[in-house]
């Protein structure tokens, strides 16, 4: 998956979760909680200023909640 594909998938969603190939499932996210870093890295802003980084290549499923 690349940045453009991910943006297209989530553009109309309000809340979504990201599932990776190694079994990680994110908390419920919205577009304000993610940033793109470098060409192939997704930054998830979590609580208390904690960040989590996911390679776009590791994304397996995106579940649109609403």
Predicted region positions:
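Short acidic DE-rich linear segments
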Residues: 1-4, 62-66
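Acidic, low-complexity, intrinsically disordered interaction modules
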Residues: 22-50
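Short glycine-rich, low-complexity segments
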Residues: 1-25
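Short linear motifs in low-complexity, proline-biased tails and propeptides
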Residues: 17-19, 48-57
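Structured surface patches comprising rigid loops and adjacent beta-strands/short helices at the edges
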Residues: 32-34, 54-65
């Amino acid at each position: 998956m690349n940045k453009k594909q991910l943006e297209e998938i989530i553009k109309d969603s309000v809340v979504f979760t990201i599932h990776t190939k190694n079994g990680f499932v994110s908390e419920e996210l919205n577009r304000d909680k993610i940033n793109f870093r470098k060409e192939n890295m997704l930054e998830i802003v979590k609580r208390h200023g904690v960040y989590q980084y996911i390679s776009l290549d590791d994304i397996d499923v995106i579940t649109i909640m609403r």
